[in-house]
């Protein structure tokens, strides 16, 4: 999955890839400025209210999210919410305890 963001000065493309090191090398070789950032993937049920349940879990646990975007699991077709948070392991444990499928 990928998401873009741009301004007058620069653009940002966020990508989830299977081989981050290879992607960094390929993009850097072409002159792109790259940064590897850890994110958390949470598989959502494909039904109304699934995103709300995830967001309520984050809110109830007082978890701040820097950014999020939606992707999908190519094998299952299920939606995956990609989250950037400060403490990935803590958030992972918290969401798993609340019944969310953390990837």
Question: Which residues make up each language-model segment?
Answer:
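A conserved regulatory-domain signal marking ACT and ACT-like small-molecule sensing domains
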Residues: 1-103
């Amino acid at each position: 999955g990928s998401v873009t963001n741009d301004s007058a000065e620069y653009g940002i493309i966020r990508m989830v890839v299977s081989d981050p090191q290879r992607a960094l090398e390929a993009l850097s070789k072409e002159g792109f400025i790259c940064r590897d950032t850890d994110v958390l993937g949470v598989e959502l049920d494909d039904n109304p209210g699934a995103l709300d349940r995830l967001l309520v879990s984050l809110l109830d646990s007082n978890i701040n999210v820097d950014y999020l975007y939606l992707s999908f699991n190519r094998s299952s077709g299920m939606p995956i919410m990609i989250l950037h948070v400060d403490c990935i392991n803590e958030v992972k444990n918290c969401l798993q305890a609340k019944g969310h499928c953390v990837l």
